[in-house]
């Protein structure tokens, strides 16, 4: 169904609700597969929601084989971004991948040997570094062990280290330098494949009539298609409820307010040409990565000692960074990098995670015919956006052709790695994965 059915109704083969980096990737892959795609987003453009607040880290250490394989396959897409999109960088400004490497510091809640085994099974290059090796190669990094996490207002936070840490070093990790632009690149690539994007288009109603979904918009228009993909980010749970979808889900989602802060790297940590590594530090409750021109991006790994800011709705979230979050996260970063300076004036961005119960995404069909979800991304799926689009395209194609994805989950074979990824790992009906860190690190 490609025709417009009336001046107030927009028809298509598939509607993607949400134009963040995930929704834009889904739209691109559906359009690339030959579908007439309509993208609806309540914002002013692609990536204007929580995507714009992403740290845009590209890393590979997760708690299951399939999630590691997913991130490793996606890495090649980011590295070959222009080719992946079919866009000419001389014609269209493109986000860029920066290879920095990453240190994943030891912590008791992430058993070391299974992590090493999973990385090896996938084929991710890595080295395990002991404390002395870290100190020799990355002298700015303190190797003290401080677990468990403590609030910075507790004197125990400043106590001497109880031991020393090693780390898994993955040299191919890095970051994308502009997450909003990356989403816009995907949206542009989708449009060049025939997709239409409609912004400032808030969905306020959703009903299935016969074999077609009809979505009502706040401005009085409507959109119709046999297929709908919910990629609404922190609004995804609400959109499911609006559509009467989700009763069968064993995995719930909730919006969580988060802050990411920016300071300046310690002198000598790295340069744009030879950047120092990102540091993932559950031991202290933080993650950090370099940025262009000496920037240092600092986020949190959800320490249990800090309050979680769960939201009833992402609408109206306070978009200003707070002194409390800034002090907590940047002080933890400075404990790990003793030469890091902590400016008095907070600087950073606010975003909202769409948190799944086990911090693992849901890429799946639903019990409602024609309704699919790319949700529960939990603040850790920017890195997987290009392949998430391919996952949804594969699931939609299989299910619309009559395949029972619940009984026989689709297997995705990586174009770049040849890895087989069981998409049942991202099922809405999966058991809660008790082995995840229950943090943004997955």
State the predicted function of each range:
Residues 55-154, 285-287:
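Dinucleotide-binding Rossmann-like beta1-alpha1 core, especially the glycine-rich loop
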Residues 28-32, 56-58, 82, 86-99, ...:
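Active-site substrate-recognition segment that forms the wall
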Residues 196-213:
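A conserved short coil-to-beta-strand element within the FAD-binding core of flavoproteins
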Residues 32-51:
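Glycine-rich FAD pyrophosphate-binding loop
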Residues 9-12, 217-227:
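Core beta-strand elements of the Rossmann-like FAD/NAD(P) dinucleotide-binding domain
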Residues 92-104, 138-193, 312-314, 370, ...:
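Helix-loop-beta segment of a Rossmann-like dinucleotide-binding subdomain
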Residues 141-160, 342-387:
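FAD-binding beta-loop-beta segment adjacent to the flavin cofactor pocket
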Residues 3-8, 128, 367-442:
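C-terminal lid/capping helical subdomain adjacent to the catalytic/cofactor pocket in oxidative enzymes
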């Amino acid at each position: 169904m490609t025709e417009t059915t009336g001046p107030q109704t927009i028809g298509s083969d598939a509607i993607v609700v949400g134009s963040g980096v995930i929704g834009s990737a889904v739209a691109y892959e559906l359009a690339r597969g030959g579908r007439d795609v309509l993208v609806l987003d309540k914002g002013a453009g692609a990536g204007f929601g929580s995507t714009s607040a992403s740290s845009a880290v590209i890393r590979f250490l997760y708690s299951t084989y399939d999630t590691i394989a997913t991130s490793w396959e996606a890495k090649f897409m980011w590295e070959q971004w222009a080719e992946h999109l079919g866009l000419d960088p001389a014609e269209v400004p493109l986000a860029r991948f920066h290879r920095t490497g990453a240190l994943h510091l030891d912590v008791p809640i992430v058993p070391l040997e299974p992590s090493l085994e999973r990385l090896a099974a996938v084929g991710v290059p890595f080295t395990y570094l002991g404390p002395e090796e870290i100190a020799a190669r990355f002298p700015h990094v303190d190797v003290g062990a401080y677990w468990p996490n403590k609030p910075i207002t507790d004197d125990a936070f400043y106590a001497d280290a109880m031991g020393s840490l090693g780390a898994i070093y993955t040299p191919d990790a890095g970051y994308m330098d502009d997450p909003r632009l990356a989403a816009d690149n995907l949206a542009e690539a989708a449009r060049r494949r025939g997709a239409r994007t409609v912004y400032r288009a808030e969905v306020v109603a959703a009903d299935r009539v016969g074999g077609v979904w009809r979505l009502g918009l706040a401005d009085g228009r409507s959109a119709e298609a046999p297929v709908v993909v919910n990629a609404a980010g922190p609004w995804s749970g609400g959109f499911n409820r609006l559509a009467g979808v989700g009763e069968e889900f064993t995995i719930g989602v909730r919006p969580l307010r988060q802050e990411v802060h920016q300071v300046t790297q310690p002198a000598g940590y790295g340069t744009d040409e030879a950047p120092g590594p990102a540091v993932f530090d559950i031991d202290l409750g933080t993650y950090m990565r370099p940025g262009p021109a000496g920037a240092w991006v600092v986020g949190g790994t959800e320490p249990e000692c800090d309050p979680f800011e769960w939201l009833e709705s992402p609408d109206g979230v306070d978009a200003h960074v707070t002194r409390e979050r800034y002090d907590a996260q940047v002080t933890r970063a400075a404990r790990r990098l003793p030469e890091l300076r902590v400016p008095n004036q907070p600087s950073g961005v606010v975003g909202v995670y769409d948190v799944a119960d086990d911090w693992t995404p849901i890429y799946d069909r639903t019990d409602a015919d024609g309704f699919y979800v790319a949700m529960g991304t939990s603040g850790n799926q920017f890195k997987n956006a290009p392949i998430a689009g391919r996952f949804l395209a594969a699931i939609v194609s299989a299910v619309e052709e009559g395949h029972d994805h619940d009984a026989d989950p689709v297997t995705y074979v990586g174009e770049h790695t040849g890895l087989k990824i069981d998409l049942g790992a991202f099922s809405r009906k999966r058991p809660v994965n008790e082995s995840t860190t229950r943090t943004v690190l997955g």
